[in-house]
Amino acid sequence: MKSATLLALSFLLIASCFLICEAEHSRYEEHEILEENMGDVVNLEQRSCAKPGEMCMRIKCCDGQCGCNRGTGRCFCK
């Protein structure tokens, strides 16, 4: 009985670690995309939005992807 309890607790610990890591990774990726949208002058044409329908340079994106005009820096829906 003790070994079954220990095995179950080990499984729960591993599962919770996996879920925590997965949650942190998705937030980190979203943060990176938002940071890219805020001031990456080098990659203006390759900016993307973290979530569909999000604002990119104050312009709402259509499908989660937006492009940026080199001259003005304003984004448009792709």
UniProtKB/Swiss-Prot annotation:
Expressed by the venom gland. It is found in: Secreted. Disulfide bonds join 49-62, 56-66, 61-77. Keywords: Disulfide bond, Ion channel impairing toxin, Knottin, Secreted, Signal, Toxin. GO terms for cellular component: extracellular region. Residues 1-23 form the signal peptide. Residues 24-47 form a propeptide. One of its GO terms (molecular function) is ion channel regulator activity. Coiled coil: none annotated. Belongs to the hainantoxin family. 20 subfamily. Putative ion channel inhibitor. The presence of a 'disulfide through disulfide knot' structurally defines this protein as a knottin. This is Hainantoxin-XX.3.
